[in-house]
């Protein structure tokens, strides 16, 4: 098992000013970090990758899509823009040295139609993702497609329908991830959800119900860790939490009150929680 920290707690773009955070996370005992990719600067990613290599920190990356580059849009030009930007994100992953590109890059974040996904949208989404997966293969990167709760997207909302989507895409570089925050909202049974997608799951976000320190809220952690162990999961456990460090990021993630002492406290306590819970399960 590898334990990591998503850097969105500090910023939506990691630059030299954030290098002390990387130093702290290495000292704390993390195996790696998750890099937000919202601006696709290959040179900057290469420099960051060098810093991470120096520290001995592994890395994954996360990105999203918006309305103007929605891979399930009825407009072919918009879909093509989404595919192109996802490919740019993969180029950045290659420069960064990231093995996984995670996130809800299957559709536009926060955009709704007033209904669930149509047959056309599912077809467009699969075609778009298959094209991205082809590029991922050339970059040596695996896609970890993330489903979100119904308040953030309408395309993929459960482990079961995401697993079906992955099977429709049918590409070895297209897999999925499981996020405890979204599952806590959408799934009727956590164990059944994890089992339903275990064949395709390559990444896990450890995220509390209020997006603060894992282990301090009401996510069903015992069932989560028990079932991950039962299904033989051995990939990343990546903490995803959000705070007030950047006003624009706080607004996007609907955070307006402080729910932890400090970012460092959250990171250290989260790592201790994950390690202790996993150790209990042999």
Region locations from a protein language model:
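Short secondary-structure transition/capping segments
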Residues: 45-48, 72-74, 113-116, 156-158, ...
